[in-house]
Amino acid sequence: MRYLTSGESHGPQLTVIIEGVPANLEIKAEDINKEMFKRQGGYGRGRRMKIEKDTIEIVSGVRNGFTLGSPITLVVTNDDFTHWRKIMGVAPISDEERENMKRTITKPRPGHADLIGGMKYNHRDLRNVLERSSARETAARVAVGAVSKILLEQLDIHLYSRVVEIGGIKDKGLYDVDMFKNNVDKNDVRVIDENIAQQMRDKIDEAKKDGDSIGGVVQVMAENMPIGVGSYVHYDRKLDGRIAQGVVSINAFKGVSFGEGFKAAEKPGSEIQDEIHYNQDSGYFRATNHLGGFEGGMSNGMPIIVNGVMKPIPTLYKPLNSVDINTKEDFKATIERSDSCAVPAASVVCEHVVAFELAKAVLEEFQSNHMDQLVAQIKERRQLNIEF
């Protein structure tokens, strides 16, 4: 299973092509759109989300509500393109029009792709970098993740996400499965502990008032993953390694950990390894989940717990120092419309990125042309956990 996205932030649309989804998976546009809507929410979002509707159109790979096994194409229309038609149009323009073009960017933002991307691709107008490096592209990745979640749910694998920390205000690092899944989306900061939700909002408001931005930590949980997905044999097949790459590829994400994460460095081995037990009904299990559902790069049947660290968004309304690439003079960086805090929305993005990595790994482990074949193989693997 793989995918490709295309489109610019203020271009006409985002396009996704997903290859490798088995035939006969029931997919409805409204189910994908529910996930798209979650990404648009969250306290601290900017004005852009009031413009966009982010509803997807399925244009190939699905017939009468079921996948065909051929590539699936999804389209997300950028409603804001109506205001950018001249600036972001594909038709050639004259040199005079280019010189007088509005919204040209020559003052790169520290922490963004602007300057290095301009150097690498020889763009003198850094908007050519900004448009693709923008987090707008994550709308396409959520669409991919939504399809992945639909697939996983047919296998009784379920994903949830939450915010753990915003601007130094922290919730508990770990919750039990029921507490986690029964308390997502309770509030607009996506934190489980309601007592700190307002503190997080106040912190976001403070950053916005100061023209600044703040980051945080998000957590994703995947429940009921079958054992043995991934591999200890080769580095590139380790499931936690693949998830780590996927998570840090999300815009502004700077770190990833599993289970108790970096706290493992503070504890002795006797307190961080998860002891193995056996039950005749359910098979092998662990009473604890310090390692976040992984052993040796493989899923061990416990809930998979992924933590992602998001830095503050680099676009600031009180911009930092920069240099104009044309004059080489000191200037304040360009101000572009942005969020003061996107951590709640980023938790949704992270959930869908993890969903894709899990779906991809499952389909590699249990190669199947259609859903009945896949379901049967998953059932057999789960039985192995009892009979081995």
Swiss-Prot record:
Disulphide bonds in the chain: none
Reactions it catalyzes: 5-O-(1-carboxyvinyl)-3-phosphoshikimate = chorismate + phosphate
Co-factor remark: Reduced FMN (FMNH(2)).
Binding site for NADP(+): 39, 45
Pfam families found in the cross-reference section: Chorismate_synt
GO term, biological process aspect, one: amino acid biosynthetic process
Pathway(s) served: Metabolic intermediate biosynthesis; chorismate biosynthesis; chorismate from D-erythrose 4-phosphate and phosphoenolpyruvate: step 7/7
Matching InterPro entries: Chorismate_synth, Chorismate_synth_AroC_sf, Chorismate_synthase_CS
Binding of FMN, residues: 132-134, 251-252, 296, 311-315, 337
A single MF term (Gene Ontology): chorismate synthase activity
SUPFAM superfamilies, per database record: Chorismate synthase, AroC (SSF103263)
The enzyme's E.C. designation: 4.2.3.5
Keywords: Amino-acid biosynthesis, Aromatic amino acid biosynthesis, FAD, Flavoprotein, FMN, Lyase, NADP
Cofactor: FMNH2
PROSITE patterns: CHORISMATE_SYNTHASE_1, CHORISMATE_SYNTHASE_2, CHORISMATE_SYNTHASE_3
GO CC, one annotated term: cytosol
Domain of life: Bacteria
Subunit structure of this chain's protein: Homotetramer.
PANTHER family (UniProt xref): CHORISMATE SYNTHASE (PTHR21085:SF0)
Family listed: Belongs to the chorismate synthase family.
Entry function: This reaction introduces a second double bond into the aromatic ring system.
Stated name of the protein: Chorismate synthase
Species of origin: Staphylococcus epidermidis (strain ATCC 35984 / DSM 28319 / BCRC 17069 / CCUG 31568 / BM 3577 / RP62A)
